[in-house]
Amino acid sequence: MMSGGPSDATHRKRRRRRGPKGSGVDGPSIPRAVTTNGAGPEEEEVVEGKAMELDAGMSAAEVGGVVGSHLSETRFDQCPVSPLSLKAIKDAGYEKMTQVQEATLPIILQGEDVLAKAKTGTGKTVAFLLPAIELLSTLPRSPSINLLVICPTRELANQVAAEARKLLKYHRSLGVQVVIGGTKLPQEQRSMQSNPCQILVATPGRLKDHLENTPGFSNRIKGVKVLVLDEADRLLDMGFRRDIEKIIAFIPKERQTLLFSATVPEEVRQISHIAMKRGYKFINTVKEGDEETHSQVSQMYMVAPLDLHFSILYNVLKKHIAEDADYKVIVFCTTAMVTKLVAEVLSQLKLNIREIHSRKSQSARTKVSDEFRKSKGLILVSSDVSARGVDYPDVTLVIQVGLPADREQYIHRLGRTGRKGKDGLGLLLLAPWETYFLNSVQDLSVSQAVVPTIDSSIQTGVKDALGRVETKSKESAYQAWLGYYNSNKAISRDKSRLVRLAEEFSQSMGLAIPPAIPKLILRKMGLNNVPGLRSV
């Protein structure tokens, strides 16, 4: 998120072996602002500023303790912002801007609409919050919502709100609230009524709920002066375009609009033309060839049959724990229910496990996320709620079990480690029939690792652990696994093969017969009447 001050802890080295480093991309690049009128050729304007050399997943909160290329030479006190904001920045220990902030802040402070291509966790949150707060501080106090920030996930929304509270420390007339799914709508309604805020951070679905169901909310949102779409590409990937268009229709046309996105595909361009004024600025803070991964991350993959995956995972984790006293591991799984199963198995094996996924309540997710952020000696088993836009410092190892949805998902998961100039490890564990995915990351220096020899004690331990896991968890994992791989075109093309692979997964959990699936769910998957699938 935001650049923080240095500390001794930031320079402490890991007590573990260092693997080979991945390939980095050399050569400077100048961030560019492109003035566009929404049609025809674009005229480029070079923005003064240094080349972007930030790590893809680095949080600005972590950047502060790093010397060298991660920070610009520009200090916040060189920026035309109010003494109250500067005081809050100083209190938080922030001195120099990240290079993303250096490239974008001056233009945003001028009131321009901006589409910024910026990697997640590079200080972009401050780049849109600080100028918006400067504008809001000049407005008469009112119950209207003046700054609306839309985020793709609850976790990211909470982080943006936390960053806003830091910057608002001395702006006592301004307040911030979060509205997200997973909390009770009436509770949020009461909170907004009793303590009207000027800054609202929201996920699209819950914001739409309030527009449709909260009395007076549509009037309050007519006071919006600044609209921010954070991680715009992910908002669109998650299917929120229609919701965003409805929300835009509710708020005033005379406003400043800021879109921050790690990638700028055509769909992001389209929404920018809808949301922003003609002549908006496009600022690219990602140097060519540097959209990918960290030079500090040693990337490896293993290929093994599904029935060995639990044993290999346990073996790798035990070795990593033995090698690094300050281990902090994230294990990414394909779905929420598979995440739950893996967490239960590893917990039965007496590892220090926390789990986080979309089936957990928001309060439980927040509690686990906060604990993992502050702790060491923990293993977080996660679905993709932790893949992007969530800041966990000092992650020593990221393991991805099973097929990532795509190259981008692989990269963003990997981006949880190798931060602050420290080394990181990434391991991708695939079944033989998943190896086609490696073609999409062959330019990322992912090397093959030897599958470890699994001794009988590990095999016995895993088998016993699986035996202690409730059958219901295995049934839910099987159904979710089948749904996930059925959505993959390369695998679902041959339904009989998909059924055989699902049976392999079922056997890997210790089930003699694949679980039966409700007929309605099979119909929704398009798998009704497929031979080999049991239904109820």
Swiss-Prot record:
GO terms for molecular function: ATP binding; ATP hydrolysis activity; RNA binding; RNA helicase activity. Pfam families: DEAD, Helicase_C. It is an enzyme of class 3 (hydrolase). Residues 1-44 are annotated as: Disordered. Its EC number is 3.6.4.13. A motif (Q motif) lies at residues 74-102. Gene3D superfamilies: P-loop containing nucleotide triphosphate hydrolases (3.40.50.300). It comes from the Eukaryota. SUPFAM superfamilies: P-loop containing nucleoside triphosphate hydrolases. Keywords: ATP-binding, Helicase, Hydrolase, Nucleotide-binding, RNA-binding. CDD domains: DEADc_MSS116, SF2_C_DEAD. InterPro entries: DEAD/DEAH_box_helicase_dom (IPR011545), Helicase_ATP-bd (IPR014001), Helicase_C-like (IPR001650), P-loop_NTPase (IPR027417), RNA-helicase_DEAD-box_CS (IPR000629), RNA_helicase_DEAD_Q_motif (IPR014014). Residues 11-20 have a biased composition (Basic residues). Residues 316-466 form the Helicase C-terminal domain. A motif (DEAD box) lies at residues 230-233. It catalyses: ATP + H2O = ADP + phosphate + H(+). Residues 105-282 form the Helicase ATP-binding domain. ATP binds at residues 118-125. The Q motif is unique to and characteristic of the DEAD box family of RNA helicases and controls ATP binding and hydrolysis. Belongs to the DEAD box helicase family. This is DEAD-box ATP-dependent RNA helicase 26. It comes from Oryza sativa subsp. japonica.
